[in-house]
Protein backbone atom coordinates (compact mmCIF):
# COMPACT_ATOMS: atom_id res chain seq x y z
CA UNK A 1 0.00 0.00 0.00
CA UNK A 2 1.41 3.34 -1.05
CA UNK A 3 0.87 6.43 1.05
CA UNK A 4 -0.33 9.55 -0.72
CA UNK A 5 2.10 12.43 -0.35
CA UNK A 6 0.91 15.31 1.78
CA UNK A 7 0.25 18.51 -0.15
CA UNK A 8 2.99 21.10 -0.40
CA UNK A 9 2.67 24.20 1.77
CA UNK A 10 2.57 27.48 -0.18
CA UNK A 11 5.00 29.67 1.69
CA UNK A 12 5.82 33.37 1.46
CA UNK A 13 9.60 33.75 1.69
CA UNK A 14 11.09 36.90 3.17
CA UNK A 15 14.42 38.08 4.52
CA UNK A 16 15.25 39.56 7.90
CA UNK A 17 18.94 40.49 8.10
CA UNK A 18 20.78 37.64 6.36
CA UNK A 19 18.31 34.87 7.17
CA UNK A 20 15.41 33.65 5.01
CA UNK A 21 12.09 33.06 6.76
CA UNK A 22 8.74 31.84 5.56
CA UNK A 23 5.11 31.86 6.60
CA UNK A 24 1.95 30.24 5.31
CA UNK A 25 0.71 32.35 2.38
CA UNK A 26 -2.88 31.82 3.54
CA UNK A 27 -2.17 34.01 6.58
CA UNK A 28 -1.03 36.95 4.40
CA UNK A 29 -3.60 39.55 3.38
CA UNK A 30 -1.29 41.93 1.53
CA UNK A 31 2.21 43.38 1.44
CA UNK A 32 2.86 47.12 1.63
CA UNK A 33 6.04 49.25 1.47
CA UNK A 34 7.58 49.95 4.86
CA UNK A 35 6.27 53.03 6.64
CA UNK A 36 7.16 54.40 10.03
CA UNK A 37 4.80 53.44 12.86
CA UNK A 38 3.70 55.61 15.77
CA UNK A 39 5.42 54.18 18.84
CA UNK A 40 3.32 52.96 21.77
CA UNK A 41 4.59 53.94 25.24
CA UNK A 42 5.43 50.88 27.32
CA UNK A 43 5.29 48.46 24.36
CA UNK A 44 8.06 45.88 23.98
CA UNK A 45 10.87 46.97 21.62
CA UNK A 46 9.74 44.47 18.96
CA UNK A 47 6.36 46.24 18.69
CA UNK A 48 7.18 49.13 16.34
CA UNK A 49 3.82 50.82 16.90
CA UNK A 50 0.66 51.64 14.97
CA UNK A 51 -0.05 52.62 11.37
CA UNK A 52 -3.25 53.71 9.67
CA UNK A 53 -3.95 51.41 6.73
CA UNK A 54 -6.89 52.80 4.76
CA UNK A 55 -8.75 53.77 7.92
CA UNK A 56 -7.83 50.69 9.95
CA UNK A 57 -5.33 50.97 12.81
CA UNK A 58 -2.79 48.14 12.56
CA UNK A 59 -0.08 47.10 15.03
CA UNK A 60 3.32 46.66 13.35
CA UNK A 61 5.81 44.14 14.75
CA UNK A 62 9.51 43.85 14.02
CA UNK A 63 10.18 40.15 13.47
CA UNK A 64 13.96 40.62 13.55
CA UNK A 65 13.85 42.25 16.98
CA UNK A 66 11.40 39.61 18.24
CA UNK A 67 13.83 36.85 17.30
CA UNK A 68 16.98 38.76 18.29
CA UNK A 69 16.46 41.68 20.72
CA UNK A 70 19.99 43.00 20.02
CA UNK A 71 19.20 43.52 16.34
CA UNK A 72 18.64 47.00 14.92
CA UNK A 73 15.00 47.66 13.98
CA UNK A 74 13.73 47.37 10.41
CA UNK A 75 13.62 50.87 8.90
CA UNK A 76 13.16 49.96 5.23
CA UNK A 77 11.71 47.07 3.26
CA UNK A 78 8.13 45.85 3.50
CA UNK A 79 5.32 45.21 5.94
CA UNK A 80 3.51 41.89 5.59
CA UNK A 81 -0.13 42.31 6.60
CA UNK A 82 -0.92 39.02 8.29
CA UNK A 83 -4.35 37.87 9.43
CA UNK A 84 -5.39 35.74 12.34
CA UNK A 85 -9.15 35.45 12.44
CA UNK A 86 -10.43 39.02 12.25
CA UNK A 87 -7.17 40.55 13.49
CA UNK A 88 -4.65 42.12 11.11
CA UNK A 89 -1.06 42.64 12.25
CA UNK A 90 1.81 44.09 10.25
CA UNK A 91 5.16 42.30 10.27
CA UNK A 92 8.12 44.49 9.26
CA UNK A 93 10.75 42.62 7.22
CA UNK A 94 13.81 43.67 5.23
CA UNK A 95 12.72 42.08 1.94
CA UNK A 96 9.84 40.02 0.57
CA UNK A 97 11.36 37.49 -1.81
CA UNK A 98 9.03 34.90 -3.35
CA UNK A 99 6.22 32.41 -2.88
CA UNK A 100 7.30 28.77 -3.06
CA UNK A 101 5.77 25.40 -2.36
CA UNK A 102 7.56 23.47 0.34
CA UNK A 103 6.90 19.74 0.28
CA UNK A 104 5.50 18.64 3.65
CA UNK A 105 8.06 15.83 3.94
CA UNK A 106 10.89 18.39 3.80
CA UNK A 107 9.62 20.35 6.82
CA UNK A 108 11.27 19.53 10.14
CA UNK A 109 8.81 20.47 12.90
CA UNK A 110 11.09 19.21 15.67
CA UNK A 111 13.20 22.35 15.45
CA UNK A 112 13.30 23.94 18.89
CA UNK A 113 14.46 27.43 17.99
CA UNK A 114 13.02 30.88 18.52
CA UNK A 115 11.04 32.34 21.40
CA UNK A 116 7.87 30.69 22.71
CA UNK A 117 7.07 28.49 19.71
CA UNK A 118 7.35 31.33 17.21
CA UNK A 119 9.38 29.12 14.87
CA UNK A 120 7.15 26.28 13.70
CA UNK A 121 9.85 24.38 11.83
CA UNK A 122 12.58 24.38 9.24
CA UNK A 123 11.76 23.95 5.56
CA UNK A 124 14.34 22.55 3.19
CA UNK A 125 14.51 24.08 -0.29
CA UNK A 126 16.90 23.33 -3.12
CA UNK A 127 19.05 26.34 -2.19
CA UNK A 128 18.98 26.21 1.59
CA UNK A 129 16.94 26.15 4.76
CA UNK A 130 13.95 28.40 5.49
CA UNK A 131 12.95 29.20 9.07
CA UNK A 132 9.15 28.82 9.18
CA UNK A 133 7.39 31.36 11.40
CA UNK A 134 3.99 30.80 13.00
CA UNK A 135 1.91 33.91 12.30
CA UNK A 136 -0.68 32.54 14.73
CA UNK A 137 1.85 32.55 17.60
CA UNK A 138 3.17 36.00 16.64
CA UNK A 139 -0.32 37.55 16.59
CA UNK A 140 -1.29 35.78 19.82
CA UNK A 141 1.75 37.29 21.56
CA UNK A 142 0.53 40.77 20.60
CA UNK A 143 -2.99 40.14 21.85
CA UNK A 144 -1.80 39.11 25.33
Enumerate the language-model features and the residues they cover.
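An acidic, low-aromatic, low-complexity terminal/linker signal
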Residues: 1-144
Amino acid sequence: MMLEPRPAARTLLFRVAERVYGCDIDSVREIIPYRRATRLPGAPPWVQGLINLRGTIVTVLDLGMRLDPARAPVRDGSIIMATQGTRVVGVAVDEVMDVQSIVAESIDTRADVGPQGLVSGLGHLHDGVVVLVSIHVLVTQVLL
